[in-house]
Regions:
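ATP/nucleoside-binding phosphotransfer catalytic cores, i.e., glycine-rich phosphate-binding loops
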Residues: 126-201
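Exposed beta-strand and adjacent loop surfaces of beta-rich binding modules
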Residues: 67-69, 119, 167-169
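Well-ordered beta-strand positions enriched in small/hydrophobic/aromatic, beta-favoring residues
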Residues: 68-70, 122, 160
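Catalytic core of DAGKc-family lipid kinases
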Residues: 1-103, 109, 116, 156
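Internal helical hairpin/lid segments
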Residues: 91-144
Length: 201
């Protein structure tokens, strides 16, 4: 069940097989406590300076957080993203950023995003937007604000079929997986759990 307004997120558990992860994609296949990447930054777990080996060995106390993922169907293959999907390039042409988390490359892009709200956050940059305007927008995002511009659009969805004017590179959690002119996305609520030390909550 996705989080409701005013509810506490997750629950305290004891678990012995938690693994510290250093990139966003590994949380899909492991009992992960991310310490690097945009997921770690979103949940406030990116400041770990050393591994708590005893906690891992003894099944120490963790806060278990249910987490949505984005499922993407493209060119007959299915991929899952824990953090984000990028289509195209920020500095030229058509570009789309599809996020499950508030952060992208360490910057808060989506102010109201929550990784367990059952929604995908989307930022669309139209292909005709000039380089100077793109750079200004990126600078504003780095400062935690947005540049209003008719060729920038921010919206939410739970499922979408996206058609592009030409084949574009598609990056899943920072890794290029294919090139396509069509992408089908949907959110899978509560798809995985991630873990942060219970004293962080």
């Amino acid at each position: 069940m996705v989080i409701a307004k005013g509810e506490e997120w997750g629950e305290r558990v004891r678990k012995s097989d938690v693994v510290y992860t250093r990139n966003d994609h590994d949380v899909l296949t492991l009992s992960a406590s991310p310490i690097k990447g945009d997921i770690a930054r979103t949940v406030g777990n990116g400041q770990q300076k050393r591994l708590d080996v005893e906690k891992l060995k003894t099944g120490g106390a963790w806060h278990q957080l249910p987490f949505d993922v984005i499922e993407a169907d493209v060119n007959g293959a299915t991929f899952r993203a824990a953090a984000h999907i990028r289509v195209g390039h920020f500095l030229w042409g058509e570009c789309h950023l599809l996020c499950n988390v508030a952060m992208f490359r360490g910057r808060r892009v989506f102010q109201k995003s929550h990784p367990n709200d059952g929604k995908i956050e989307v930022l669309t940059i139209e292909r005709d937007m000039k380089l100077r305007q793109r750079l200004l927008a990126i600078m504003r995002v780095r400062k935690g604000s947005h540049l209003p511009h008719p060729q920038l659009k921010i919206w939410q969805t739970t499922a979408e079929v996206m058609h592009f004017q030409r084949p574009l590179p598609i990056f899943i959690d920072g890794v290029k997986v294919t090139t396509s002119d069509t992408l089908r996305i949907s959110v899978i609520p509560d798809a995985i759990n991630i873990y942060i030390p219970s004293d962080h909550k």
